């Protein structure tokens, strides 16, 4: 069973993902894969270097993620090129891990699950949701960005309404951690029951 887990920035995906990991689910983390692929000499690192030269790299060869992110927000052409490089490489690695490590319950932790069409390889999708105002407040505290930057990031993602309409299950993470975990437990049991049927 392959289950996608997604949600807007600062919605609490990691909190929920950690709960599922504690239950023994096999977690495939798209952000972690992306970081691995941009390590010096990695497949995406090589492609970024070939396309952008040294302009987005530190002197030691590491990718300057903050600079690249800023360029992507201000230039649609750069954003599209970076996505053309990243998304196929991340998808290929996710598919490789699914096939190499078959598991009764594999959770794909993918922030841009719908934008990258990875929901199509999932049997079910869980969306972690919070109101946009709370998303902005949490993101400002967590990421050290200002409110305008958070609004820009949110606007660059699929709309909350669209994300919710594509979900099989929704976790409301706007209350206590205990309440979020309770929802995780209920959804986990429902998915296991469906898988057993």
UniProtKB/Swiss-Prot annotation:
Pathway: Cofactor biosynthesis; coenzyme A biosynthesis; CoA from (R)-pantothenate: step 5/5. One of its GO terms (cellular component) is cytoplasm. InterPro entries: Depp_CoAkinase, P-loop_NTPase. ATP binds at residues 10-15. Its EC number is 2.7.1.24. It catalyses: 3'-dephospho-CoA + ATP = ADP + CoA + H(+). Residues 2-197 form the DPCK domain. CDD domains: DPCK. It is an enzyme of class 2 (transferase). It is found in: Cytoplasm. One of its GO terms (molecular function) is dephospho-CoA kinase activity. It comes from the Bacteria. GO terms for biological process: coenzyme A biosynthetic process. Keywords: ATP-binding, Coenzyme A biosynthesis, Cytoplasm, Kinase, Nucleotide-binding, Transferase. Catalyzes the phosphorylation of the 3'-hydroxyl group of dephosphocoenzyme A to form coenzyme A. NCBIfam families: dephospho-CoA kinase (TIGR00152). PANTHER family: BIFUNCTIONAL COENZYME A SYNTHASE-RELATED (PTHR10695:SF46), DEPHOSPHO-COA KINASE-RELATED (PTHR10695). Belongs to the CoaE family. This is Dephospho-CoA kinase. The gene is coaE.
């Amino acid at each position: 069973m392959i289950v996608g887990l997604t949600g807007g920035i600062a919605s609490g995906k990691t909190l929920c993902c950690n709960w599922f990991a504690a239950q023994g689910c096999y977690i495939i983390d798209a952000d972690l894969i992306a970081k691995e692929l941009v390590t010096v000499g990695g497949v995406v690192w090589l492609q970024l270097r070939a396309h952008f030269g040294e302009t987005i790299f530190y002197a030691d060869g590491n990718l300057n993620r903050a600079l690249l992110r800023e360029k992507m927000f201000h230039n649609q052409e750069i954003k599209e090129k970076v996505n053309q490089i990243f998304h196929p490489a991340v998808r290929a690695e996710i598919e490789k891990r699914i096939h190499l490590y078959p598991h009764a319950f594999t959770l794909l932790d993918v922030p841009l699950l719908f934008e990258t069409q990875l929901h199509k390889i999932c049997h079910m999708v869980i969306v972690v949701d919070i109101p946009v105002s709370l998303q902005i407040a949490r993101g400002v505290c967590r990421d050290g960005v200002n409110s305008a930057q958070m609004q820009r990031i949110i606007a660059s993602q699929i709309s909350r309404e669209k994300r919710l309409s594509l979900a099989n299950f929704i976790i409301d993470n706007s209350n206590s951690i205990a309440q979020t975990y309770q929802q995780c437990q209920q959804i986990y049991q429902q998915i296991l029951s469906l898988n057993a049927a």
